[in-house]
Amino acid sequence: MTLAATAPAARTASTRPVFLALQANDETLSIISAITADNPHASVAHFPAMVKIDAPGHLVVRRASVEDHLGRDWDVQELHVNLISLSGNIDETDDEFRLQWRDHA
């Protein structure tokens, strides 16, 4: 009897919406500016003490962009300090934090 190996299901990017919800404070305003500059397809909603960023398909937070807006070095892990909630699958490196849903084809 021979067993055939099956390849894992291919993953494709989804167009389902993702979001980030961050505390509204002086530091996150610069982070939000960087996010909206890098994600022109995103929409921003301001609430008391919170800012929610929605985007169809994906949302990316780039370290270099945030550093430019903050005017200092910034570690992607610092995003978690002000993170309230999110939706989507997370891909995180030293250079970016990416949200997107992955559907199996």
Label for each model-derived stretch:
Residues F47-M50, A55-A105:
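Helix-rich interaction surfaces within compact, conserved domain-sized segments
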Residues T2-A7, T36-P40, I84:
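Short amphipathic beta-strand starts and helix->beta connectors
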Residues T2-I32, A49-H69:
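Conserved N-terminal glycine/acidic-rich loop preference
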